[in-house]
């Protein structure tokens, strides 16, 4: 492939004419051109002559591992298996796979192509439709919110890992300083009581449950979100270590993060395989796996099954956080992002499915040991990985080894996902503000330190309430809304046909009709459906038996609204900050920056019916 450099006279972004345009001093532009095998020359990048060229991944595998590492996170382990079990087992795979094909993969593909072609972060990528730049700011803010509490979950895993380096795991028995007088060894409990009155997984007084809630969280010392107390020094130290690891993984950009993921993205698969092989040899494991895979097609008649499948496929793939756009922006221009989208999204979903075998083999073992039904031990979320699984491990031969291995896996799953979220923030803002790009290391430190400071609220004695609030509202309806606007902005305002031409310039072929129809109709409809359902199904926030006060719910909606409001707010700002008539302001707002000179010539594609009908 031939790489050539040219230095033509490039027109300013606003075209230099018309009432809505500005005329900044002309700068020399450097255009990189790739000459493909068929002789067609494609634009690789355009930048000011005094700017540094955009870095790229050291190797293609660095990019793939980064995407897989981000998408495959803790939810693959603690949420999907339980959803599959409670929604008809194998039958749940039907709506899950359907939504993967018609919505998950198309959105995944769209974000990779968008970032790779424009070589920009989540905010500046909207030079394709300036009015929608607020969408970029919204997803950056959401990614920042997630960083506030996600790092705390990683810190919990690190604390558990340190606690595992003992001959006897601290959650094996009672008698520790954190245990209550009610602490009871589960082996001594009456199984009929567990089976008839409460789920085993919700039983509060087992050593594992008390270690988590009293030894780690110190939840018993808080009466609610209004009484969170001070940060706990043990978790504070763990959080500091996590933030330091994240900082040094990101401070030099993808050159360093691309190497870290060789460990963090591959290690979980090795550990998962080891846990699976050992798990299926345990007594009762087959019962757990049978419960996981049982097929109940009648459950497909229930709307909740389809809703769970839709929301899980969306959040599992991680579209909308600006991460995929940021990662793809460091690809080579002619990289085959179509193949990457299919490969990485498939790996993510297959991982979710396989992890269910490792989880339910252990749950079957737990049910067998305590002579209860599978439904009495099956659960999701933090209770699964910080109570049930550790308790099961404590009963195994060589429990210390298995605990260390398991929590190393959780650490790896969390670290690379958190790296992705922070990279979205750093790349998104650094591309928008050149001063931040010139001082990337300092900016990376500022982002890391900022997330650390806000995370302090989540490691207090009532921190779990703050974490639950953020987890529910920071990236719930708001991220669904942001991706809906992203899909509309790309498919309708920028245009599916133009977007397809961009992809053809990169890879030499246009997306098929199937992808174009999904982008324009199916994916937006899917997202609209999920947004509406998330609002309709909203219930006042709770944590176990604790009901959050009304004001806490309003604070949560304020957090959600703070990101969503950026979308219309930026449209209003852009409209009133642009000079010209109403028609001209609208035209400049929905026309790609590179075509603003056409607006001055009144050649406005978006004002023609053909633009909106094109596929």
UniProtKB/Swiss-Prot annotation:
Residues 1-60, 115-133, 253-255, 331-336, 427-441, 491-520, 568-615 are cytoplasmic. It holds the Pfam family SNF. It catalyses: (R)-noradrenaline(out) + chloride(out) + Na(+)(out) = (R)-noradrenaline(in) + chloride(in) + Na(+)(in); dopamine(out) + chloride(out) + Na(+)(out) = dopamine(in) + chloride(in) + Na(+)(in); dopamine(out) + chloride(out) + 2 Na(+)(out) = dopamine(in) + chloride(in) + 2 Na(+)(in). Dopamine 2 binds at residue 380. It is a multi-pass membrane protein. (R)-noradrenaline 2 binds at residues 85-86, 380. The keyword Transport applies. GO terms for cellular component: axon; neuronal cell body membrane; plasma membrane; presynaptic membrane. Glycans are attached at residues 182, 190, 196. SUPFAM superfamilies: SNF-like. It comes from the Eukaryota. Na(+) 2 binds at residues 71, 76, 316, 348. Dopamine 1 binds at residues 73, 143, 315. Palmitoylated. Palmitoylation regulates protein levels and neurotransmitter transport. GO terms for biological process: amino acid transport; dopamine uptake involved in synaptic transmission; norepinephrine transport; sodium ion transmembrane transport. One of its GO terms (molecular function) is dopamine:sodium symporter activity. Keywords: Cell membrane, Cell projection, Disulfide bond, Glycoprotein, Lipoprotein, Membrane, Metal-binding, Neurotransmitter transport, Palmitate, Sodium, Symport, Synapse, Synaptosome, Transmembrane, Transmembrane helix, Transport. Na(+) 1 binds at residues 69, 72, 416-417. (R)-noradrenaline 1 binds at residues 73, 143, 147, 315. The chain crosses the membrane at residues 61-86, 91-114, 134-164, 232-252, 256-280, 305-330, 337-360, 401-426, 442-462, 464-490, 521-543, 547-567. Mediates sodium- and chloride-dependent transport of norepinephrine (also known as noradrenaline), the primary signaling neurotransmitter in the autonomic sympathetic nervous system. Is responsible for norepinephrine re-uptake and clearance from the synaptic cleft, thus playing a crucial role in norepinephrine inactivation and homeostasis. Can also mediate sodium- and chloride-dependent transport of dopamine. Monomer. Can form homodimers in the cell membrane; homodimerization is mostly mediated by cholesterol and lipids, and regulates neurotransmitter transport activity. Interacts with PRKCABP. PANTHER family: SODIUM-DEPENDENT NORADRENALINE TRANSPORTER, SODIUM/CHLORIDE DEPENDENT TRANSPORTER. Belongs to the sodium:neurotransmitter symporter (SNF) (TC 2.A.22) family. SLC6A2 subfamily. This is Sodium-dependent noradrenaline transporter. It comes from Bos taurus (Bovine). The lineage of its organism: Eukaryota, Metazoa, Chordata, Craniata, Vertebrata. The gene is SLC6A2.
């Amino acid at each position: 492939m031939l790489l050539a450099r040219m230095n033509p006279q490039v027109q300013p972004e606003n075209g230099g004419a018309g009432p809505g345009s500005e005329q900044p001093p002309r700068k020399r532009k450097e255009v990189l051109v790739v000459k493909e095998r068929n002789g067609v020359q494609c634009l690789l990048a355009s930048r000011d002559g005094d700017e540094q060229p955009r870095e790229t991944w050291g190797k293609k595998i660095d990019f793939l591992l980064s995407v897989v590492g981000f998408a495959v996170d803790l939810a693959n382990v603690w949420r999907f298996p339980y959803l599959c079990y409670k929604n008809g087992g194998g039958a749940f795979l039907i709506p899950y796979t359907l939504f993967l094909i018609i919505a998950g993969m198309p959105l995944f593909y769209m974000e990779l192509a968008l970032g790779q072609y424009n070589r920009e972060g989540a905010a500046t990528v909207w030079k394709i439709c300036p009015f929608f730049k607020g969408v970029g700011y919204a997803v950056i803010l959401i990614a920042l919110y997630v960083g506030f509490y996600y790092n705390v979950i990683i810190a919990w895993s690190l604390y558990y890992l340190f606690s595992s380096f003992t001959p006897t795991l601290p959650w094996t028995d009672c008698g520790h300083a954190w245990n209550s007088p009610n602490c009871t060894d589960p082996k001594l409990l009456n199984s009929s009581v567990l089976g008839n009155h409460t789920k085993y997984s919700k039983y509060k007084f087992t050593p594992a449950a008390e270690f988590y809630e009293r030894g780690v969280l110190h939840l018993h010392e808080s009466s609610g979100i209004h009484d969170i107390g001070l940060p706990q020094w043990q978790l504070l130290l763990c959080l500091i270590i996590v933030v330091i690891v994240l900082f040094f993984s990101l401070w030099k950009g993808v050159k360093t993060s691309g190497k870290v993921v060789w460990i963090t993205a591959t290690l979980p698969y090795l550990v998962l395989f080891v846990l699976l092989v050992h798990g299926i040899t345990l007594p009762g494991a087959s019962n757990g796996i049978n419960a996981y895979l049982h097929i109940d097609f009648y459950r497909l008649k229930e709307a909740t099954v389809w809703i769970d499948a839709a929301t899980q496929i969306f959040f599992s793939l991680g579209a909308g956080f600006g991460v995929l756009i940021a990662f793809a922006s460091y690809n080579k221009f002619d990289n085959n992002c179509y193949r990457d989208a299919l490969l990485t999204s498939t790996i993510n979903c297959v991982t979710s499915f396989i992890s269910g075998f490792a989880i339910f083999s252990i749950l079957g073992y737990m049910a067998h040991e305590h002579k209860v039904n599978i439904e009495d031990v099956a659960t999701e979320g933090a209770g699964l990985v910080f109570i049930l699984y550790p308790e099961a491990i404590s009963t195994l031969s060589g429990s210390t080894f298995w605990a260390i291995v398991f929590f190393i896996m959780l650490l790896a799953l969390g670290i690379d996902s958190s790296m992705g979220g922070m990279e979205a923030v750093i790349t998104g803002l650094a591309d928008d503000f050149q001063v931040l790009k010139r001082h990337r290391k300092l900016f990376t430190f500022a982002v890391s330190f900022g997330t650390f400071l806000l995370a302090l609220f989540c490691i207090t004695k009532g921190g779990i309430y703050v974490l639950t609030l953020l987890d529910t509202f920071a990236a719930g309806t708001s991220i669904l809304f942001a991706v809906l606007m992203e899909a509309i902005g790309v498919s309708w305002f920028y245009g599916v046909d133009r977007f397809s031409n961009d992809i053809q310039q990169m890879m030499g072929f246009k997306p098929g009709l199937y992808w174009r129809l999904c982008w324009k109709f199916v994916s937006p409809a899917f997202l609209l459906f999920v947004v509406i359902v998330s609002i309709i199904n909203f219930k006042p926030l709770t944590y176990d038996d604790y009901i959050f006060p009304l004001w806490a719910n309003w604070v949560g909606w304020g957090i959600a609204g703070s990101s969503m409001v950026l979308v219309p707010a930026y449209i209003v700002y852009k409209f009133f900050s642009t000079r010209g008539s109403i028609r001209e302001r609208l035209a400049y707002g929905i026309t790609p920056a590179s075509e603003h000179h056409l607006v001055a010539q009144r050649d406005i594609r978006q004002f023609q019916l053909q633009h909106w009908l094109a596929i």
